[in-house]
Amino acid sequence: MRIILLGAPGAGKGTQAQYLMDKYGIPQISTGDMLRAAIKEGTPLGLEAKKVMDAGQLISDDIIIGLVKERITKADCENGFLLDGFPRTIPQADAMKENGVVVDHVIEFDVADEVIVERMGGRRVHPGSGRVYHVVYNPPKVADKDNETGEELIIRADDTEETVRKRLGIYHEQTMPLVDYYQAEAAAGNTQYHKLDGTQAVDAISKQLGELLG
């Protein structure tokens, strides 16, 4: 069960990734985690990546693909894996294909921009404990105060409307073309493509995923 999750930041991919990992016993492969592990282990690719990062440059797709190929040969990927946040661009998707990284299912979480802005913009955090509230979906008992301590809640910089819209802009420009790419791959019989309404309740989406993937 090799799965790619697609969807804008705040579309609920992280929540469902956890469900899929638990249900199918597969690891989530994050490029950030892979990079850190390879650098720590001092693998040839890790050393190469460290050199690039130390020079303040961006890691090339070649290095990332190399890390993905290395990672999916490990024992915990025997039953499959889950990719979230990669590939982000068409060249990365092409490189994966050229390197023989096969994917069984691509799942898109479809959520309108305005819903994401409301979802993320409504988050409030208690800095001391990390407790997260939402002004609409999970409001504190007293507005802008933590339930346990009564201390002020804050809006994280990542959740301001301006930042959220900027991230959505990057997503539409870079990652949205992957929707067409993988739909074409599915039409050619190379993978299965599933588009889910990401505004449904978490449990409803999990149930749908379970039915789709079997």
From Swiss-Prot:
The EC number(s) this enzyme carries: 2.7.4.3
Catalytic activity: AMP + ATP = 2 ADP
Pathway(s) per entry: Purine metabolism; AMP biosynthesis via salvage pathway; AMP from ADP: step 1/1
Segments for region (NMP): 30-59
Binding site for AMP: T31, R36, Q57, L58, I59, G85, F86, P87, R88, Q92, R156, R167
GO annotation (BP), single: AMP salvage
One Pfam family cited in the UniProt record for this chain: ADK_lid
Signal peptide: none
Stored CDD domains: ADK
Disulfide topology: none
A single Gene Ontology CC term: cytoplasm
Keywords: ATP-binding, Cytoplasm, Kinase, Nucleotide biosynthesis, Nucleotide-binding, Transferase
PROSITE patterns documented for this protein: ADENYLATE_KINASE
Gene3D superfamilies noted in UniProt: P-loop containing nucleotide triphosphate hydrolases
Region LID, annotated ranges: 122-159
SUPFAM superfamilies reported for this sequence: P-loop containing nucleoside triphosphate hydrolases (SSF52540)
Quaternary structure and interacting proteins, as annotated: Monomer.
Domain observations: Consists of three domains, a large central CORE domain and two small peripheral domains, NMPbind and LID, which undergo movements during catalysis. The LID domain closes over the site of phosphoryl transfer upon ATP binding. Assembling and dissambling the active center during each catalytic cycle provides an effective means to prevent ATP hydrolysis.
Function field: Catalyzes the reversible transfer of the terminal phosphate group between ATP and AMP. Plays an important role in cellular energy homeostasis and in adenine nucleotide metabolism.
Name assigned to this protein: Adenylate kinase
Gene: adk
